Amino acid sequence: MTDSPAPRASVQLIQTGGAAMPLVLIHDACGTIYTYHALSKLGRTVYGIGNPRFEKCTSWTGGIGEMAACYHAAIKQRIRRGKILVGGWSLGGVIALEIARLFADDAAIHVHGVVLIDSPFPSKATVTGEDLQLPPLPPGLPANRRQSVAFAMREAVDLLGDWDPKASWQRADKKPPPAALIRALDYLPGSSADAQRDEFLVDRMRTQKLLGWENSGLDFIRATYEAPGHHWGIFSSENVACLSDTLSKACAELEVVDGGR
């Protein structure tokens, strides 16, 4: 496993829509955007950005900041100008927030809002990624794909533990755009409201309404929504329609909030 020089991300079209602000969704900790293709029509153009280092299992030595810079450049190349929404599931929401910071002074593209899909506030784990509970994977998934998912998940734990969103925005002397938080209703199987085990990092702050963001010092989340299922189940076949409706509503409501310009 070696480091890769300057990977180039691609912005993939997931849905076409009307004149509403386009939504750019960033990959989750697994590194892929397959789940976003399961979303029902959101009434807007939707793009997705996957981890360009997923296939080769190479590291982001520059952390969340390096990932965000890579995806920021890809968005500028694809969209060019206008108001957009950015967001993502889990890790994707955290990266999206940093992408919004990189666009804070951009004259052509303005991030009007951020959507966090069950994205807890970054916290340091006391165990290695190998000890964390991985999401259920399709039985027929090839071994090399399983390896890529496991590598991406382990790295995500380290990247999130080392990331401080507040410090990043303070260095830029900017405030984040308004955000909407969609949170899963349930705990992972084996987890609970009083479980603090690191295998269940995504549930450690589930008792808090803003999943820990209330302690971030950023004060940017304007609305919260709930989605049926646990963290790994909100995109399941039985829950994705409800999640889609909630995401559509969150985006529509973000559009009418003052986005700072």
UniProtKB/Swiss-Prot annotation:
Pathway it works in: Antifungal biosynthesis
GO terms of molecular function: hydrolase activity
Key words of the record: Hydrolase
Gene3D superfamilies linked to this entry: alpha/beta hydrolase
Record-linked Pfam families: Thioesterase
InterPro entries tied to this protein: AB_hydrolase_fold, Thioesterase
Biotech uses: FR901469 inhibits the activity of 1,3-beta-glucan synthase from Candida albicans and Aspergillus fumigatus. With minimal inhibitory concentrations (MICs) against Candida albicans and Aspergillus fumigatus of 0.63 ug/ml and 0.16 ug/ml, repectively, FR901469 displays greater inhibitory activity than other 1,3-beta-glucan synthase inhibitors such as, WF11899A, echinocandin B, aculeacin A, and papulacandin B.
Cleavable signal peptide: none
Uppermost EC category: hydrolase
One of the GO BP terms on file: biosynthetic process
EC numbers for this chain: 3.1.-.-
Function in brief: Thioesterase; part of the gene cluster that mediates the biosynthesis of the antifungal antibiotic FR901469, an inhibitor of beta-1,3-glucansynthase, exerting antifungal activity against the pathogenes Candida albicans and Aspergillus fumigatus. FR901469 is a cyclic depsipeptide containing 12 amino acid residues and a fatty acid chain. The NRPS frbI contains 12 modules responsible for the formation of the depsipeptide backbone which is denoted as Acyl-Thr-Ala-Tyr-Val-4OHPro-Thr-Thr-3OHPro-threo3OHGln-Gly-Thr-Orn-OH (C71H116N14O23).
Family: Belongs to the AMT4 thioesterase family.
Name this protein carries in UniProt: Thioesterase frbD
